[in-house]
Amino acid sequence: AMFDPQMLLELVDSGMYLTQCYGMTETCGDGLVNYAQAEPHIRALGRPDGHCEYKLDETGEICIRGGCVMLGYYKDPEATAEIIDAEGWLHTGDLAREDEDGYYYMVGRKKNLIILGSGENVSPEELEQKLSACLAVQECVVKEMGKKIGALVCCSEDRQPEVRAFITELNRTLPLYKRITAVEFSADPLPRNTMGKLLRR
């Protein structure tokens, strides 16, 4: 999960020096490193550390190849083939974009993508981050609701109009296909799995 950029900036302002790292068990922890202490790069995953090769494939998925990448899952060639392609690239499942300075920025998880009937792909995490900027939103999940982009929002009943107004303003900044056109509210915390991650069902 990504850190809140505002929190990172506050830590820097308090005198801390931050180093952010992106990686996974299957790459021995190797990945991207971010030494940035200010905007805009403090919100990035980082840049390649030089130990392996990195690229974004045609879908924007982060791929890693080199000595840091595992040979495969123990006695599970099928699972290995699902994550490592014939050219040796490990597909992380994370979607990102790369800026002109070589920094990678998280967009979302490939498995969470909402694929619309029109062919466009929508990252729910991107919209959740934007929606979370509304102070009335305690937590939220963006998902497909009856062929619409919808949001399930946890907030107090008296602040629901504030959230609706925020979504209206947010939608004006988004392409038509990304706009949130359905919203449901919950006064209770949203359901999570045993790992503490919000459920998208």
What are these regions (language model features)?
Residues 1-104, 110-113, 127-128, 138, ...:
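Conserved AMP-binding/adenylate-forming
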Residues 3, 158-159, 191:
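Glycine-/small-residue-rich active-site loops that bind phosphorylated ligands and cofactors
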Residues 66, 71-72, 95-178:
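AMP-binding/adenylate-forming catalytic core of the ANL superfamily
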Residues 142, 182-185:
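Hydrophobic/anchoring residues in structured secondary elements
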Residues 186-201:
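Flexible lysine-rich "adenylation lid" loop at the C-terminal edge of ANL adenylation domains
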